[in-house]
Regions:
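Pyridoxal 5′-phosphate
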Residues: 1-191
Length: 191
């Protein structure tokens, strides 16, 4: 990743987004960009943020960064898997794809008609499948993004967030689709 070739002034990168440990990140600052310090203390982290650097987390971040494949390969892999997942989901009655077609392929948001997100999360987790109902930073709150898309409360309340990474396989996505189909069949029987 070469932010200086991308025309950006500032870029933040979170370790946990590339399978590294939580608590570490990186900040690219274009030469000549002025930052205003908001917290004061030591001289760590370029005088931008005081406090002891989490050395083990930083080392883990470095190892994770070294392990990721070329960005283009990663993007192609994720795009192919997202397209495969969406094509499979479109064959299931009661599934709505909420993500725009031109969204980055790493997150796919869907709604499963008639099954609240929390019920679906529990059902899938009992099968060893882990998805979420929203972003980690807004846990417990309805998605601001889905609200901004003017989606109905029913769609928002049944939304699932599916993550795809360089380690995701077609077999895992097939198992996810089987889990969603199974959940829908189970809920129909219970009604």
């Amino acid at each position: 990743l070469k932010p200086y070739n991308m025309g950006v002034d500032l870029m933040s990168i979170s370790s946990h987004k590339i399978h590294g440990p939580k608590g570490a990140g990186a900040l690219f600052v274009k030469k000549g960009t002025r930052l205003v310090q908001h917290t004061f203390g030591g001289l760590q982290e370029g005088k931008i943020r005081p406090g002891t650097e989490p050395t083990p987390a930083i080392a883990g971040f470095g190892a994770a960064a070294a392990a990721i494949p070329d960005y283009r390969e990663s993007l192609l892999h994720a795009t192919q898997l997202r397209d495969y997942l969406v094509s499979r989901l479109k064959t299931i009655d009661g599934i709505r794809i909420n993500s725009p077609a031109d969204a980055l392929p790493y997150i796919t948001n869907i709604s499963v008609e008639g099954i609240p997100s929390e019920v679906m999360l529990n059902y899938l987790s009992n099968m060893g499948i882990y998805v979420s109902s929203g972003s980690a930073c807004s846990k417990g709150h309805k998605s601001r993004v889905l609200k901004a898309m003017n989606l109905s409360e029913d769609i928002i309340n049944t939304a699932l967030r599916i993550s795809i990474s360089v380690f995701t396989t077609k077999q895992e996505l097939d198992y996810l689709v089987e889990g969603i189909v199974s959940a829908r069949q189970t809920m129909k029987r219970l009604k």
